[in-house]
Amino acid sequence: MAPLRSPHDSTTQLVLQTIDAYERSAKECVARWSKRRHRRPPLLAEWLTHLPADASLLDIGCGGGKDADDLDRRGYRVVGVDRTSALLLAGRRRYRSLSLVRADLRSLPFQAMAFDGLWAAASLMHLPKPDARRLLADLCKLVRPGGLFAATVTYGMKSRLVTDGWVPGRYFARWKKDELARAVRRAGWTILELNVVTNRERKGRWINVIARRGG
């Protein structure tokens, strides 16, 4: 008799498929991101208004390091973390001064209260929702009291593995507004902003959230 598979097995497989997709497409991803005119996303700009000028920041799912480099150039102390080796290698070659760490987002290797702010642009959406909920609670422990978290996730009803597009094979968890709000609050955050927006560059509707750790 074959051993029973737990729900964790299937969610892990979705994460691994997404990582593999980025490993295969890393060069294309970095080239595409680097060609874009780098305009600071409005959510990022808003998040930074709440943070001190010398804040210690973690870029969660940093990919090739473009956002981390933007923050580093503006004087923040930045660490980027991602699971995809090829993206990190490209980032280290392009941005030699950056601290880029390879780690699974579901098991981050940082000490409690190590950061003032956490930035997660289009990264939590690649985790199945049970994993994302656990990560939200873990992230709350990584920031100091009063620390800020900002994230973008895909909006909608259906989560699915996308087999087409410019990086085929990625999993996308789509969230409803009230569903994400509940998950963020239950993880210990106080929501400052949570809005559904249309992103013309990435196409489609997204949820932007900024939240603060109490205490």
Language model segments and positions:
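A short glycine-rich, Lys/Arg-flanked "PGG" loop and its adjoining helix->strand segment in the class I
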Residues: 133-145
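Short, glycine-/aromatic-enriched active-site segment of Class I SAM-dependent methyltransferases
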Residues: 154-171
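Conserved beta-strand signature within the Rossmann-like core of class I S-adenosyl-L-methionine
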Residues: 146-153
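Short alpha-helix
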Residues: 172-187
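Conserved class I S-adenosyl-L-methionine
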Residues: 2-52, 157
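Conserved S-adenosyl-L-methionine
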Residues: 189-200
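Class I SAM-dependent methyltransferase SAM/SAH-binding core
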Residues: 58, 64-107
